[in-house]
């Protein structure tokens, strides 16, 4: 599993909001400049986060984006699943994927399934608040 740029940037943006307190609307341009992300690419990420209900969006003068929950309520897993679609290490264990012709005799399938569970539990066990707290101790 390789986390895409979209997933990494989405995490950075969510941390950015949380560090700012999450209350005020932050203009897209300001977020892009602060995080070193192209405004065009960030629009796509923010659209994804907004449509999924992770952030609130207000358009026009004085508008921008903000968190609509506490940082403790956003897991890294939920953000990455939204942006990546799947956190599966191999395609045959991806939810909704067509069954592999060898799935019934694949000796490695149980291992891949356990790995997927470990990855899911790991990322679901980390919140945006945890990321901020850990970075403050470095």
Where are the model-predicted features located?
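A short alpha-helical element within helix-turn-helix/winged-helix DNA-binding domains
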Residues: 26-36
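Short, hydrophobic-biased segments on the C-terminal half of alpha helices
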Residues: 46-47
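Beta-hairpin "wing" of winged helix-turn-helix
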Residues: 54-62, 66-67
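Non-DNA-binding regulatory cores of transcription-related proteins
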Residues: 68-138
């Amino acid at each position: 599993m390789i986390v895409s740029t979209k997933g990494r940037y989405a995490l950075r943006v969510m941390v950015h909001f949380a560090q700012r307190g999450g209350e005020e609307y932050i203009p897209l341009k300001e977020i892009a400049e602060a995080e070193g992300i192209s405004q065009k690419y960030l629009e796509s990420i923010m659209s994804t986060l907004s449509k999924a209900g992770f952030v609130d969006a207000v358009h026009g003068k004085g508008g921008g984006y903000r968190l609509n929950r506490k940082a403790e309520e956003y897991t890294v897993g939920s953000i990455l699943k939204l942006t990546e679609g799947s956190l599966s290490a191999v395609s045959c264990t991806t939810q909704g994927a067509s069954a592999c012709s060898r799935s019934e005799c694949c000796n490695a399938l149980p291992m891949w399934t356990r790995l997927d569970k470990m990855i899911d539990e790991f990322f679901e066990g980390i919140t945006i608040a945890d990321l901020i707290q850990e970075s403050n101790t470095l």
